[in-house]
Amino acid sequence: MKRKKSREMTMQLLFEMMIKKENYVEIINTLKEALTEEEDINSILGEKKEMDEERIDLDEVDLEYLIHTLKGVEENSKVLDEHIEKYLKNWTLNRLAKVDLAILRLCSYEILFSNEVPDNVAINEGVELAKKYGDDKSPAFINAVLDKIAKQM
C-alpha cells in the first residue's frame, strides 16, 4: 500500500511541477514547508486536524521513492517525452491533459528506468491513477500508450 500511495503523491507533485513550472527541488522544498507549517499549527492548537479522505498521509508515503522518482522523471524528461510522443496518434504532448501527461511520465519512467517495478504493475497503476484523476477516456488512453512503451523494450 505504501508504494501505491507514494506513486499517487509523486504523480500529484509531477502535475504541480508542470503547472507551476518548478523543478523537483523546489516542489520538495514547498512540500517540506507545508508540512512544517501544518505541524506548527497543530502544536499551537494542541490537536490534530481531521484528515480529509483525498489527502495522503505522509506516514504512508515512501519519501525516498518519491524524491528519487521526481528527480528521475525530471532528468530524463526528454527521453520520456520522446517515447510517449511516439505513440500518440494525432496528438502532441502540448495537447494532452496535464494529469494524463503526469501519469504517462511517471509510469514511463518506471517502465524504462526502474528495475523495482514490473512493467505490468506500472501500467496497471497508471490506469488506476487515470480512473481517479483523468477523464472518462484517460484509462484506456493511458493503458494503450504505456503498453506500447513496455512492448518496445
Swiss-Prot record:
This protein's UniProt keywords: RNA-binding, Transcription, Transcription antitermination, Transcription regulation
Domain of life: Bacteria
Pfam family, one: NusB
Signal sequence region: none
SUPFAM superfamilies: NusB-like
GO cellular component: cytosol
Annotated InterPro entries: NusB-like_sf (IPR035926), NusB_fam (IPR011605), NusB_RsmB_TIM44 (IPR006027)
GO annotation, biological process: DNA-templated transcription termination; transcription antitermination
Described function: Involved in transcription antitermination. Required for transcription of ribosomal RNA (rRNA) genes. Binds specifically to the boxA antiterminator sequence of the ribosomal RNA (rrn) operons.
Cross-referenced HAMAP family: NusB
Family: Belongs to the NusB family.
Protein name: Transcription antitermination protein NusB
Gene name linked to the record: nusB
